[in-house]
Amino acid sequence: MKLSLKAEIEVYIMKIGEYFDDYEFACSCHRHEVDENGHNKLDHIIDKRLVDLLDRIRERLGVPLYINSGYRCPEHNAEVGGASNSQHVLGTAADITYDGIDVDYLASIAEECGADGIGCYYYQDFVHVDVRGYAARWNDLD
């Protein structure tokens, strides 16, 4: 049975968390978004702890967050020069920003909200957050 375009869109775009849709976490290469049956795989790849963290950050910040990079398939991660053990490949990391970003302020909110890994990227105006299970801090000024 062929679905209508509206039904196809509704099946593809699934709300995960309070503020985010699954497509916001998709690998930008779009190579591995669906399984062999045509079902969206992102709801199985993205760690719920990450979604919960981002919801808390968004709530605390009070303005929309934008996900620059969420899940990355291993191939795309290698293409962009990501670490081989990148949290993005595990579905446990996101690079986030907001309009008028203050990197230090966003990083402090991420820490208050329980982020494990926090990377400040001042030159590109985003903060990496993850739920790796232990604390890690870095920035692009080092």
Question: Where are the language model's segments positioned?
Answer:
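Extracytoplasmic cell-surface/polysaccharide-interacting catalytic and binding patches
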Residues: 1-60, 124, 133, 141-142
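Catalytic cores and adjacent binding grooves of peptidoglycan-active enzymes
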Residues: 2, 6-10, 85-142
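Short, exposed beta-strand "edge-strand" segments with a Pro/Gly-rich flavor and a Y/T-containing core
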Residues: 11-20, 65-70, 99
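Intrinsically disordered, low-complexity segments enriched in small/polar residues
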Residues: 15, 36, 80, 112-117
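The N-terminal extracellular segments of secreted preproproteins, especially immediately downstream
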Residues: 26-28, 72, 112
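Amphipathic alpha-helical interface surfaces
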Residues: 46-53, 63, 76, 92, ...
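Extended, low-complexity, intrinsically disordered C-terminal regulatory tails
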Residues: 51-81
